[in-house]
């Protein structure tokens, strides 16, 4: 009897321990807490996207999700998601990821896409937080579908340019602007947070683009990758078309197989 009670007690201890290992686990490659791999099965991923998801994994690109609210350092917060609630958005993202070559993500040191909701940086809502240092993009999967794709491509462009000096590239790009123009300098400080694509802003695809050269470039890239009629829509905006050529040429060099 004592032996049975002891065994039962040990089983309870093991169950509690295993639960706590998950609850307080840290994903070692990027040191993020409370995340795990998104299952590649037909409960979550549509039939037409299964092969794409598997191919991404074969090339060391993984989609993960937050199963518990997480706080990173003192300035990043993101809430858990119930993956079943975001099936449509998850599949939409996979379709967008298919636009990149099989070697692209390794070329920019991007291996982990972490999905969560209500992502905040310094208490301000943001679509994504990229970090090449840990090959990770934390991304808000709860965004409205109409801005989901462009937000993903915007953040991917930031990852394309991290950890290298692009001063000459930025200078060449900035020369397309009017000589008198100066970027605002602080995306989160400015009142120019309108991210609607607009073909009547001379040299820019959105008002938000006017904040920094990096945001300008990321917005152009996001527009190119998410719009099916970019050239037609911006045909009246010569400077935007010139910027597109610079950005797309830069992208093609990285996106080659």
Model-derived segments and spans:
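Classical Sec-dependent N-terminal signal peptides that target proteins to the secretory pathway
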Residues: 1-26
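Intrinsically disordered, low-complexity N-terminal regions enriched in serine/proline/glycine
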Residues: 36, 61-66, 85, 99, ...
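A general structural signal for short secondary-structure junctions and capping/turn motifs
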Residues: 2-8, 105, 207-210
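Residue-level recognition of hydrophobic positions within alpha-helical transmembrane segments
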Residues: 7, 92, 211-215
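Residues at the start of alpha-helices and the adjacent loop-to-helix junctions
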Residues: 15-17, 70, 210
């Amino acid at each position: 009897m004592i032996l049975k009670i002891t065994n039962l007690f040990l089983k309870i201890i093991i169950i509690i321990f295993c639960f706590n290992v998950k609850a307080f686990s840290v994903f070692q490659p990027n040191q993020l807490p409370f995340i795990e791999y998104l299952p590649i099965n037909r409960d979550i991923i549509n039939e037409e996207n299964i092969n794409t998801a598997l191919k991404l994994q074969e090339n060391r690109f993984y989609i993960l999700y937050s199963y518990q609210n997480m706080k990173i350092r003192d300035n990043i917060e993101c809430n858990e998601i119930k993956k079943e609630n975001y099936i449509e958005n998850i599949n939409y993202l996979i379709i967008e990821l298919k636009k990149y070559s099989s070697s692209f993500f390794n070329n920019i040191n991007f291996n982990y896409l972490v999905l969560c909701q209500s992502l905040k940086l310094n208490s301000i809502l943001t679509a994504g937080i990229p970090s090449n240092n840990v090959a990770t993009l934390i991304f808000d999967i709860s965004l409205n579908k109409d801005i989901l794709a462009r937000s993903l491509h915007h953040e991917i462009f930031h990852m394309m340019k991290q950890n290298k000096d692009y001063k000459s590239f930025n200078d060449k790009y900035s020369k397309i602007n009017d000589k008198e123009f100066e970027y605002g300098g602080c995306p989160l400080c400015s009142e120019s947070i309108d991210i609607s694509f607009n073909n009547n802003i001379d040299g820019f695809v959105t008002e938000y683009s006017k904040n920094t050269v990096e945001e300008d470039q990321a917005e152009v890239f996001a527009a190119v990758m998410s719009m099916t009629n970019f050239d037609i829509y911006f045909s009246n905006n010569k400077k935007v078309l010139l910027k597109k050529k610079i950005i797309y040429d830069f992208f093609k060099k990285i996106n080659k197989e």
